[in-house]
């Protein structure tokens, strides 16, 4: 998703969702417009000490999903408008998915 943003990123998210309806899709993105279409968000964390680097993976709940989308937009955890926009992105993606599924 390098070099895209805005409406183009939303279209990519819609297309990825269309593919994901019949196949498993694993996507790594820093675009909230694409991430909003995910059915499941996994958060990757790295922990390093002087000898090793460990990577952990955990599934985010709904509140964490919105917070993470706001974070990748560059907002702080206290930024209510970014949190609201992140929630709206997820809601919009869910409406799109519901509409597509109703067509079946």
Named regions from a protein language model:
Residues 1-2:
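Short loop immediately C-terminal to the Walker-B catalytic DE motif
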Residues 7-104:
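C-terminal lobe/lid and adjacent interdomain/linker elements of RecA-like ASCE P-loop ATPase modules
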